[in-house]
């Protein structure tokens, strides 16, 4: 299935000059969403994954159906102040400032094999932060799966030491 035909492109959103790739049009088509989920499930099975991790919010909508299909758990990565129990945190730089992501301190057990999922790889900052959190808890990142990779932003450079799969790639 050619998933690219299900991606909507929104010009000048969220700001002028940006051509936003919207995956909600994959999700609102049961066949396309199921296909994308199944592809990531197969990728995860080959890596003997114990748990799925996904950053908010779209990492949830990619990772949760994969975890459910595999009969394994899902651990969320969230912005600071959004998780109710004790957390670990990772602060990283943005173009104009910083951001903080957190995970529950008991979300990952040492040695667990982790697949990180998200909708889109752009600059790689969010996924790099998720990797740092997983590894701080002793998890082993055995794969990272995206629906879309924006190759022209070179986000792969931040995660080049990991096994990465993307279902759709945009060169420009």
From Swiss-Prot:
It catalyses: AMP + diphosphate = 5-phospho-alpha-D-ribose 1-diphosphate + adenine. GO terms for biological process: adenine salvage; AMP salvage; purine ribonucleoside salvage. Its EC number is 2.4.2.7. It is found in: Cytoplasm. It is an enzyme of class 2 (transferase). One of its GO terms (molecular function) is adenine phosphoribosyltransferase activity. One of its GO terms (cellular component) is cytoplasm. SUPFAM superfamilies: PRTase-like. Keywords: Cytoplasm, Glycosyltransferase, Purine salvage, Transferase. Pathway: Purine metabolism; AMP biosynthesis via salvage pathway; AMP from adenine: step 1/1. The keyword Cell membrane does not apply. Gene3D superfamilies: 3.40.50.2020. NCBIfam families: apt, PRK02304.1-2, PRK02304.1-3, PRK02304.1-5. Homodimer. Catalyzes a salvage reaction resulting in the formation of AMP, that is energically less costly than de novo synthesis. Belongs to the purine/pyrimidine phosphoribosyltransferase family. This is Adenine phosphoribosyltransferase. The gene is apt.
């Amino acid at each position: 299935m050619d998933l690219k035909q299900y991606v909507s492109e929104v010009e000048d959103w969220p700001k002028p000059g940006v051509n936003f790739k919207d995956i909600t049009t994959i999700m609102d088509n049961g066949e396309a969403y199921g296909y994308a989920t199944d592809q990531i499930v197969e990728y995860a099975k080959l890596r003997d994954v114990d748990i799925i991790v996904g950053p908010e919010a779209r990492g949830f909508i990619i990772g949760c159906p994969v975890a459910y299909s595999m009969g394994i758990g899902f651990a969320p990565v969230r912005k600071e102040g959004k998780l109710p129990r004790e957390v670990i945190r990772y602060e990283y730089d943005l173009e104009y400032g910083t951001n903080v992501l957190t995970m529950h301190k008991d979300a990952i057990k040492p040695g667990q094999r982790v697949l990180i999922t998200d909708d889109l790889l752009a600059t790689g900052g969010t996924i790099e932060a998720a990797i740092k959190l997983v590894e701080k808890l002793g998890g082993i990142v055995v794969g990272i799966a995206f629906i879309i990779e924006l190759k022209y932003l070179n986000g792969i450079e931040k995660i080049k030491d990991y096994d990465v799969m993307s279902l759709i790639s945009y060169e420009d």
